[in-house]
Amino acid sequence: MTDYTATAICEGDHWVIDVPGVGTTQAETVDDLEDMAVDLVTAMTHTARQDVHVELRIV
């Protein structure tokens, strides 16, 4: 399993999620943050979802 740290920042009516070394994505709600971060990592690294762990930090 590969560990990543994502940072989420509220920007108006949406959230911006940054995963260093991977990329940036956005989400509409707090409930979507972790799933969107994991989706970003799996898409950009071609890694299976079960092999990814994302620690989410909301700032």
Model region roles, listed by residue range:
Residues 8-10, 29, 50:
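Short stretches within intrinsically disordered, low-complexity N-terminal or propeptide regions
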Residues 19-32:
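A short, exposed loop/beta-hairpin motif centered on an aromatic-Gly-Thr core
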Residues 2-19:
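Short aromatic-glycine-(Arg/Gly/Cys) micro-motifs in beta-strand/loop hairpins
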Residues 6-8, 23, 37:
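Small side chains
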Residues 1-4, 35-59:
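Short, charged, surface-exposed hinge/linker loops at domain edges
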